[in-house]
Amino acid sequence: MTEAKVEVYYSLQSDYCYFLLDRLLQLSQRQVAIVIQPILGGVLRLPERFKDRDELEQNYFLTDAARAADFFGLPYAPPNPSPITFKPGSLWVAEDEQPLNEYLYRLFVGSTRAGYGLEFLDKVGRMLWDGSTPDWDQGDNLKDKMREAGLDLEAILSSTSWENAKQTLDQNAAGILEAGHWGVPLMVFEEEPFYGQDRFDHLLWRMKRRAVL
């Protein structure tokens, strides 16, 4: 059986990425290399695509996300605070300044470069979305979760400036389009894109057809 690799474009702002996380961890235990590609949320990466979305779409999105979490048996609550700061009165329009998001993505990119992308998502990424830690940005919450992932927060910050992390994020913003879609989560296996957590079973099917599972 040939060792396989799956690239995953993953945004910390996406609940659907969180819904996929446990399945990625399970797949990584099956001699499959999961290569995490950190990517900014769509409202920052593709603001023109999101600026005119309306309340009908937003309301369905909220319904679907809660249903998906229930279906997978996952604890779920939107991050408090949101990593992305939105303009008052808007649905999906971000402010120009994003200090919290930039700080978080320095940790994400730095952890991925250190070879701990999945571990970071399992601890820090999960904390953002499982409702366990309101005010996740306060105190030692991030430091403690980084430690649980085998990472040192201060060392990662020291080695990963925002300007440095942004270079990787810009490369991944181009890479996801080259791979075949703009949305997350996007899984890529042998240059074939699988968009959305609900395409995970299609990914497994393809890998079995290629005799790598």
Predicted stretch roles:
Residues A4-K5, S11-V32, L121-L213:
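C-terminal cap of thioredoxin/glutaredoxin-like
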Residues Y10-S11, E55:
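Short, charged/polar micro-motifs that form catalytic or ligand-binding hotspots
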Residues Y18-L128:
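Structural alpha/beta surface segment adjacent to cysteine/selenocysteine redox centers
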